[in-house]
From Swiss-Prot:
E.C. code: 2.1.2.11
Protein name per the record: 3-methyl-2-oxobutanoate hydroxymethyltransferase
Keyword Metal-binding: yes
Principal cellular location given in the protein's record: cytoplasm
Any one cellular-component term (Gene Ontology): cytoplasm
Pathway in which the depicted protein is active: Cofactor biosynthesis; (R)-pantothenate biosynthesis; (R)-pantoate from 3-methyl-2-oxobutanoate: step 1/2
GO molecular function, one term: 3-methyl-2-oxobutanoate hydroxymethyltransferase activity
CC cofactor note: Binds 1 Mg(2+) ion per subunit.
Disulfide bond as UniProt keyword: no
Primary gene name: panB
Subunit annotation: Homodecamer; pentamer of dimers.
Length: 264
């Protein structure tokens, strides 16, 4: 696989070519994903739940994300690697710059930040300092205590309108990718069409430019339960490499996510 950059993702959006993304936390799986030509890998704070066994992502630290980013980069030199900014690691622009710098030095190509238009100034400051940003909207797991649990976002008209506004504001501030989690498919399609930057979805229907899954869900090895928006590709194929290839094919062909993986 050739080295992937944000320019490739922009080109694919313009061409209408969908792309697959998956979380990765270590060199071995990162290497497997690169060999199967997964273009984008996310070192997610989901590691707090799937690796550390916590009930949410809040305890994860910047140092832990940096460690796993180094591991993923070692295994996958050519993928575009996004690294999550953990809870409270970007409470101020100064904190954001310091912690984003650690993740970029660990091998990330981009950092991911959760939040709406209130993080626009932070996004702008990072972009001005050569740190590409993916802005995460919808169900933002770091806000689980505000939401009262892991709930679908953007179902009422006012919240849907605010999410569209958030996406456009963050794009204008310099965000180079928008990630939508657990939002109605119709809203995700609207945001995807409104934004000029690539939009990645998880539990957001199949109209987004890209899809992302937590690797443990894709392989059916999550400790607790399988989210509605996920699919066990390993059960279907019986082989990890074939499972990754099937996931990529289904995303590119627009057959995943199907109706049963989608919220309305």
């Amino acid at each position: 696989m050739k080295k992937i950059s944000i320019h490739d993702l922009m080109k694919w959006k313009q061409e209408g070519k969908k792309f697959a993304t998956v979380t990765a936390y270590d060199a071995s799986f990162a290497q497997l994903f690169e060999q199967q030509e997964v273009p984008v890998l996310l070192v997610g704070d989901s590691l707090g739940m799937v690796l550390q066994g916590k009930s949410d992502t809040l305890p994860v630290t910047t140092e832990e994300i940096a460690y796993h980013t180094r591991c993923v980069r070692a295994g996958s030199p050519n993928s575009l690697v996004m690294a999550d900014m953990p809870f409270m690691s970007y409470a101020t622009p100064e904190q954001a710059c310091e912690n984003a710098g650690k993740l970029m030095q660990a091998g990330a190509n981009m950092v991911k930040i959760e939040g709406g238009e209130w993080i626009a100034e932070t996004v702008r400051i990072l972009a001005e300092r050569a740190v590409p940003v993916c802005a995460h909207l919808g169900l933002t797991p770091q806000s689980v205590n505000i939401f009262g649990g892991f709930r679908i976002q953007g179902r009422d008209e006012a919240k849907a309108e605010q999410m569209v506004k958030d996406a456009l504001t963050l794009e204008a501030a310099g965000a180079q990718i928008i990630l939508l989690e657990c939002v109605p498919a119709s809203l995700a399609e609207r945001i995807t069409k409104a934004c000029t930057v690539p939009v990645i979805g998880i539990g957001a229907g199949n109209a987004t430019d890209g899809q992302i899954l937590v690797m443990h869900d894709m392989f059916g090895i999550s400790a607790n339960y399988m989210p509605k928006f996920s699919k066990n590709f390993l059960a279907e194929t019986g082989d990890m490499r074939k499972a990754v290839t099937k996931y990529i094919q289904d995303v590119e062909q627009g057959t995943f996510p199907a109706a049963e993986h989608t919220f309305n």
